[in-house]
């Protein structure tokens, strides 16, 4: 173990004497350098502050000259916080003496993490009231929000820390501040069920605002199922009759899908219906005219009278469809919960073996997501992955003869086409290109869908449609992590891992062959100058290499490390393969390699075509 790791471990474990022994013979400059050396992403001072080792903190600051503001990586509850200053770590962990020591040595009180979280916000998160008081006394800014626009007051409300929320309000925290998504501290109370804090906020003139999804705190409480908040707010004079009706209807839907309490749902739906028809026909607030019937909902219609509502009791499945209809009407298709619970209901059907209902619901949710979310949204990616996992499960069990259900070409092809459309949307959005991890996941899921599609028998028209869709993908020239093309990914073992459950197995000769037949560039290069042939070789796949060579792959092209695919295969398989280099090497290749090996000048002396050929080697 090197000395920097030993110093870090001593700081982490609070072993002051060991640290002194390690550093006693070092010069001041060496001690300062070791105090700022990062191990596992963090400095000795950061890790000592995290675990509250005050003597070690004093030693590092006073004897080693440690930088009191230098941030790093630190772990809390299994999550790595990047760019966390020592003061943030001590505040989050609740170590008041360390907080005092760091501030006495000049730690900036508003120094933030990479996500713009302040030490004050960290203390508010975990309910450390004394630290909150101390930081505010030392000029901590109450209004510095994190990258999501979430303030100290908001997180105190969400976590239910009443005394901290009260203290912040007394110190003048903005009660109506909005986050990036438009939610206020009242929304956080509603989502967490913090009724007493909500009452405090309302006494401080908090306003019932709508967030970016059009949600009021009342609706937010209905979505999360906090009946105490709903009951309090529906009796407030500021809630209109229509708002009360919507809140009770939505709470009923939450009882169906989240709490799985159908009788409880009926109680709230009855109350909503009574409110709708209060005052008789003349004063009724009827539901809006229903749109077209939705096959995914089994063509169910929302009930509009008390008689129709009571008839639901005999049909639990119809009640579940009512919950989906109610949620879509009130929240709208853009709200994440609308598509989430449609997918949830589909998953319940799948668990009971009703795959047809599941697929219908999931397709409807996917269309909703693609119409309302950004391209390659994590929610949409999750939907595509769920389809791939479901199709894989059905195909495997059908092959074993344990399942009567089957996957149709139309279902699988429909999802594949939508997934390629998602990539097309992302590529078209040039001003906001997708993040590489999102793009990589999307391409990986598409390859898994192709893997499954290759297992189905296809007629000529179906084969044409499949190839047409693959061509649409290849035409975009999409690149995953490391510059991998779909062909690189098809011959890479790492593509196998896409979710929690197995789907396809890679490298896949079937998928690679399909991509080649549809025009994939067999000599395309990734960012390390690897061709698909290099990747296949590194994965020990001579059969796939042979297919690539038949498709025109250049056998002895070199990558950035000046390695050929054959050299990678030799290293991977220790010569246990039937691929013979002389069968694929031309005299022209040997000449090009000789020019490269002897560094002979050639640029400007031969044709551009010949120059490009030599550069391959």
UniProtKB/Swiss-Prot annotation:
Gene Ontology MF: a single term: ubiquitin-like ligase-substrate adaptor activity
PANTHER family tied to this protein: ANKYRIN REPEAT CONTAINING (PTHR24173), PROTEIN FEM-1 HOMOLOG B (PTHR24173:SF78)
Sequence ranges of the TPR repeats: 245-279, 339-372
Pfam families: Ank (PF00023), Ank_2 (PF12796)
Function of the protein: Substrate-recognition component of a Cul2-RING (CRL2) E3 ubiquitin-protein ligase complex of the DesCEND (destruction via C-end degrons) pathway, which recognizes a C-degron located at the extreme C terminus of target proteins, leading to their ubiquitination and degradation. The C-degron recognized by the DesCEND pathway is usually a motif of less than ten residues and can be present in full-length proteins, truncated proteins or proteolytically cleaved forms.
Family annotation (SMART domains): ANK (SM00248)
Keywords tagged on the record: ANK repeat, Cytoplasm, Mitochondrion, Repeat, TPR repeat, Ubl conjugation pathway
Subunit record text: Component of a CRL2 E3 ubiquitin-protein ligase complex, also named ECS (Elongin BC-CUL2/5-SOCS-box protein) complex.
Cross-referenced PROSITE patterns: ANK_REP_REGION, ANK_REPEAT
GO BP terms, alphabetized: negative regulation of inflammatory response; positive regulation of inflammatory response; proteasome-mediated ubiquitin-dependent protein catabolic process; protein ubiquitination; regulation of ubiquitin-protein transferase activity; ubiquitin-dependent protein catabolic process via the C-end degron rule pathway
InterPro entries given in the database record: Ankyrin_rpt, Ankyrin_rpt-contain_sf, TPR-like_helical_dom_sf
Subcellular location: Mitochondrion; Cytoplasm
Family: Belongs to the fem-1 family.
Pathway the protein takes part in: Protein modification; protein ubiquitination
ANK repeat intervals: 2-32, 40-70, 82-111, 115-144, 148-177, 181-210, 213-242, 482-524, 528-557
Gene Ontology cellular component terms for the protein in this record: Cul2-RING ubiquitin ligase complex; mitochondrion; ubiquitin ligase complex
Protein name as catalogued: Protein fem-1 homolog A
